[in-house]
């Protein structure tokens, strides 16, 4: 598990993985998200029309698969 500093240093790597998972997220969305979990959940809701619980579940699944902690 990585700490916040390590995650920040690897943001570009994880940004790519996020775009693979959620292709509707734009580069502008990624700038807004910039390592902030609540922003990611909100942008997934906005782009995919998901309820918060569905967006949250997707993020948890993604975090688990990628061993990512905010």
UniProtKB/Swiss-Prot annotation:
InterPro entries: CsbD (IPR008462), UPF0337_stress_rsp (IPR050423), YjbJ (IPR026042), YjbJ_sf (IPR036629). It comes from Salmonella typhimurium (strain LT2 / SGSC1412 / ATCC 700720). This is UPF0337 protein YjbJ. The gene is yjbJ. Disulfide bonds: none annotated. NCBIfam families: PRK10428.1. Belongs to the UPF0337 (CsbD) family. Pfam families: CsbD.
